[in-house]
Regions:
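Hydrophobic, aromatic-rich transmembrane alpha-helices
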Residues: 264-286
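Aromatic- and kink-enriched transmembrane "portal" helix at the membrane-lumen/periplasm boundary
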Residues: 20, 41, 62-69, 73, ...
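Signature aromatic-anchored transmembrane alpha helix within multi-pass, membrane-resident enzymes
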Residues: 282-285, 330-361
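Transmembrane-helix motifs of polytopic, lipid-linked glycan transferases
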Residues: 8, 74-95, 133-137, 326-330
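Perimembrane helix-loop-helix junctions
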Residues: 142-143, 170-200
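C-terminal luminal/periplasmic domains and tails of membrane-associated envelope-modifying transferases
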Residues: 380-391, 398-404, 410-616
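Membrane-interface transmembrane helices that cradle and orient dolichyl/undecaprenyl
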Residues: 92-95, 118, 134-152, 157-159, ...
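Transmembrane-helix signature of polytopic, membrane-embedded enzymes
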Residues: 4-7, 12, 87-110, 129, ...
Length: 616
């Protein structure tokens, strides 16, 4: 098979499996936000992803379905399958045998993390497609040294940045390769200038963001009124404080997690071929090694220093994983060629089929989202709990963007006014009020919340913070909290929670989905506690922690509830679990200090407070 036919075959096979396991609706985290931005040509979270917004909208127009989320999920699967096809084509172009190239591409297609992102609305498939194209074009430009190849490479590099900022992590390897292989490249001023202009030309698609910002009914993350705001959006300024913020111990912990992740992405029997392939690439295809090895090094340098919820960290290693998949193909090919010295390897096709089958079987169940309606049902349950003409203020990623999607795109409960507490999508502030200093914005939002409370409309919150009015309190009402004047009868108006969605089993539920299910149990505990059933409430809180056992926020919130109910040892266990999940957050240590102080263990309390202080 030629490189093109191998790539096409890989794409078709990957896409077929993705369609079988495709999520039928909105999913967790940023899925709802991205769908709302694509369908309404809005401006999603930094860095904006204009290429996905435009191409995803085009695909949704072409598709004949009347299920908006499903169409954008298909777009995600299409680009992911194309990335796998590009990987097979690249390997074939580098001399890897067709069956081995096809196998390596499918092994990556069915790797744990990439598959999970291919079947929901996400940008990573398209981003990695551009990564493969840039690697292929850099190799061609360095070998043929045609000016038009260099210009096309520059354009692809710029375009890749509009898909995901990870693209910049392969740039150092590209520059090193061009300077190394293209003699006098740096001295060709005209070519260098034209190449830079080509990069700018590819990147010019970001003009979509200020042109569309605030227009139409799509999701808009934030106003982009000027050049500074645009730069902050494009560069991901919101996330900068999370980079290079970890101590050495944190970097080592992330390195350990990356290594464990790599062990689980492909079958354990294939792991030696990953690193053997790197060695073979170094010996036989130095150009390919420079690009892939440089990308892996840059990816690890950035991601190992990145502090975020550990459950969300694996996607930040996808660049390193696709480069390791390239090494896997090179190593697998070398193994087959060595065995071929003893005669024609008749076992090649069965061996390739077995390798793909092992990885496919290992990851199918946990990657299958075809029956996963939990996120959508949670959003619908939240909206169903609201009385007519209510106001709901949301925050966080668990449900905020699911609710935004349901109301913005599917028009569920249009009588409800939905606001995001920090201004993502639907904001209490007017568009021009985002020019105010952050502290003034916070005060203004609080004032608006108070005005809503006094207006007489039922005001509900997803997460209770500090009440905007004195003499008012948050009262659990079903899955939400209602803000109302302090009541003398706490049992009045209790709402029965429908728990069916919390008990869905028989399908794989990742950490984010289980966090949603745990919210049912946590709110059941809140309602029972309000009704005076402390024993039942404690049992419900414990069940919430059992369901979302790897969620730092759930374990911490349960610990806090146990502490307030004087269940100190149980509170300590959950606080310790929260600290183990993310050792670089101060709140669990501060809570543990309060627990120890209440137990009279003041020495331990002082040490824990010191630890909390160091992390703030």
């Amino acid at each position: 098979m030629t490189g093109k036919s191998t790539g096409l075959f890989a794409s078709v096979m990957a896409f077929a499996v993705y369609m079988l396991t495709l999520c039928p609706t909105v999913y967790v985290e940023g899925s709802g936000e991205l769908i709302g931005a694509v369908l309404g040509l809005g401006t999603p979270h930094p860095t904006g992803y204009p290429l996905f917004c435009l191409s995803g909208r085009l695909i949704s127009v072409i598709l004949p379905f009347d299920r908006p989320a499903y169409e954008i999920n298909i777009a995600s699967a299409f680009f992911a399958a194309a990335a796998c096809g590009g990987l097979a084509w690249l390997l074939r172009e580098r001399g890897v045998q067709a069956w081995v190239a096809l196998t390596s591409a499918l092994l990556f297609a069915f790797s744990r993390t990439f598959w999970s992102q291919a079947v929901v609305a996400e940008v990573y498939g398209q981003a990695l497609l551009l990564v493969v194209l840039v690697i292929a074009m850099a190799l061609r430009a360095s070998e043929r040294q045609y000016p038009r190849d260099v210009l096309l490479l520059g354009w692809l590099m710029g375009l890749g940045l509009t898909a995901h900022l990870m693209q910049v992590l392969i740039w150092p390897g590209v520059v090193v390769l061009l300077v190394w292989r293209c003699s006098g490249f740096i001295r060709q001023v005209r070519l260098v200038v034209l190449a830079i202009l080509a990069v700018v030309g590819g990147y010019s698609l970001v003009a979509y963001l200020p042109l569309r910002n605030g227009l139409g009914d799509g999701f808009h993350w934030d106003p982009i009124p000027d050049a500074l705001s645009l730069w902050q959006h494009l560069s991901g300024a919101l996330y900068r404080s999370s980079f290079f913020s970890l101590p050495l111990e944190g970097m080592l912990l992330n390195a350990q997690r990356w290594f464990v992740q790599v062990m689980g992405e492909f079958h354990l029997l294939l792991v030696p071929l990953l690193f053997w392939g790197g060695y073979v690439a170094w010996r036989r295809d130095r150009d390919l090694f420079v690009l892939t090895g440089g990308a892996i090094a840059c990816n690890l340098l950035a991601a190992l220093n990145y502090h975020r919820d550990p459950n969300g960290l694996p996607v930040f290693y996808l660049l390193s994983l696709i480069c390791l998949a390239i090494w896997l193909g090179v190593g697998f090919d070398d193994l087959v060629r060595k065995l071929g010295r003893f005669g024609r390897p008749a076992f090649l096709v069965p061996l390739c089929a077995m390798a793909v089958g092992l990885v496919l079987a290992d990851h199918y169940t946990e990657s299958d989202r075809s029956e996963n309606w939990i996120a959508e049902r949670y959003g619908r349950d939240l909206l169903a709990d609201l009385p007519a003409d209510a106001v709901l203020i949301v925050e966080g990623d668990d449900a905020a963007f699911v609710l935004d999607y349901l109301q913005r795109i599917e028009k569920v409960r249009p009588d409800v006014s939905l606001y995001n507490r920090v201004g993502r999508g639907m904001d209490l502030l007017d568009w021009d009020e985002h020019d105010l200093p952050p502290r003034e914005q916070g005060r203004l939002r609080k004032r608006r919340e108070g005005e809503l409370a006094r207006s007489g409309r039922p005001l509900f919150y997803l997460v209770p913070r500090r009440a905007p009015l004195d003499g008012w309190e948050f009262t659990p009402k079903g899955l939400l909290y209602r803000l109302q004047p302090v009541s003398t009868n706490p049992a009045t108006g209790q709402v029965q929670i429908e728990m069916a969605n919390a008990m869905v089993e028989g399908l794989f539920r990742d950490a984010w989905v289980r966090k949603i299910q745990s919210n049912y149990w946590f709110m059941a505990g809140e309602n029972l506690m309000r009704a005076g059933d402390a024993t039942g409430a404690i049992a419900a809180y414990q069940q919430a922690a059992s369901v979302a056992y790897d969620s730092r926020t759930t374990r911490f919130n349960v610990a806090l509830k146990f502490y307030k109910n004087n269940k100190l040892e149980d509170a300590m266990l959950h606080a310790q679990a929260a600290a183990e999940i993310d050792p670089w957050k101060a709140d669990p240590y501060q809570l543990m200090a309060h627990i120890r102080r209440k137990q009279g263990r003041n020495g331990e309390a002082r040490e824990l407070l010191k630890k909390a202080g160091e992390l703030r």
